[in-house]
Amino acid sequence: MSQTAMSETYDFLFKFLVIGNAGTGKSCLLHQFIEKKFKDDSNHTIGVEFGSKIINVGGKYVKLQIWDTAGQERFRSVTRSYYRGAAGALLVYDITSRETYNALTNWLTDARMLASQNIVIILCGNKKDLDADREVTFLEASRFAQENELMFLETSALTGENVEEAFVQCARKILNKIESGELDPERMGSGIQYGDAALRQLRSPRRAQAPNAQECGC
């Protein structure tokens, strides 16, 4: 198997969203996660941008297909169509902007109404590097997350702090739900697909049983 083919082998594929008001650094978070560097010439997203990356979560290889949605109101009707079947989401606000924090409830309502039934959401307070200009306290956001059953991290797309951890935590919780039976990857609209590696494991018991069936003389 070629190195390229090996690098594309994964156990699961998860559809992710990055949502929140314009100017919160959503595209910069995605760029930092994919490229491991800060995107310093970022303009507001027009419609939807896309990125993907394979990560190792507890020994499972998970490919994240990530849709970065525009935060401006005029694009909401377009971006809502991408919510369908999302398994996970980063709900992003800017810790230096009270306005972006106050808009979280609307974004959360859209995600839970339009995405998959069991969508896993992590709240990300971005621009942690601008702590001196903070308008939203860690405690206040932590309470919001607890009240709405969200995970929560403060992140910095500039320094990279907690950026990968946000995606990994969200993916880990989805994996836990699959293992517990709460999520079924084969259910339409789950936002989850089996990768080649997982499909091989699912099929291997059937192959192992085949010789026994042939040996039967009845």
UniProtKB/Swiss-Prot annotation:
InterPro entries: P-loop_NTPase, Rab4, Rab_GTPases_membrane_traffic, Small_GTP-bd, Small_GTPase. GTP binds at residues 23-28, 42, 44-45, 71, 126-127, 129, 157-158. Mg(2+) binds at residues 27, 45, 68. The modification Cysteine methyl ester is found at residue 218. Regulated by guanine nucleotide exchange factors (GEFs) which promote the exchange of bound GDP for free GTP. Regulated by GTPase activating proteins (GAPs) which increase the GTP hydrolysis activity. Inhibited by GDP dissociation inhibitors (GDIs). Its main location: membrane. The modification 5-glutamyl serotonin is found at residue 72. GO terms for biological process: antigen processing and presentation; neurotransmitter receptor transport postsynaptic membrane to endosome; protein transport; Rab protein signal transduction; regulation of endocytosis; vesicle-mediated transport; vesicle-mediated transport in synapse. The modification Phosphoserine is found at residues 190, 204. Phosphorylated by CDK1 kinase during mitosis. Serotonylation of Gln-72 by TGM2 during activation and aggregation of platelets leads to constitutive activation of GTPase activity. GO terms for molecular function: G protein activity; GDP binding; GTP binding; GTPase activity. GDP binds at residues 23-28, 126-127, 129, 157-158. CDD domains: Rab4 (cd04113). It holds the Pfam family Ras. A motif (Switch 1) lies at residues 44-49. Disulfide bonds: none annotated. Interacts with SGSM1, SGSM2 and SGSM3. Interacts with RAB11FIP1, RABEP1, ZFYVE20 and RUFY1. Interacts (membrane-bound form) with NDRG1; the interaction involves NDRG1 in vesicular recycling of E-cadherin. Interacts (in GTP-bound form) with GRIPAP1 (via N-terminus). Interacts with RABEP1 and RBSN. Does not interact with HPS4. Interacts with RABEP2; this interaction may mediate VEGFR2 cell surface expression. The small GTPases Rab are key regulators of intracellular membrane trafficking, from the formation of transport vesicles to their fusion with membranes. Rabs cycle between an inactive GDP-bound form and an active GTP-bound form that is able to recruit to membranes different sets of downstream effectors directly responsible for vesicle formation, movement, tethering and fusion. RAB4A is involved in protein transport. Also plays a role in vesicular traffic. Mediates VEGFR2 endosomal trafficking to enhance VEGFR2 signaling. Switch 1, switch 2 and the interswitch regions are characteristic of Rab GTPases and mediate the interactions with Rab downstream effectors. The switch regions undergo conformational changes upon nucleotide binding which drives interaction with specific sets of effector proteins, with most effectors only binding to GTP-bound Rab. This is Ras-related protein Rab-4A. It comes from Homo sapiens (Human). The gene is RAB4A.
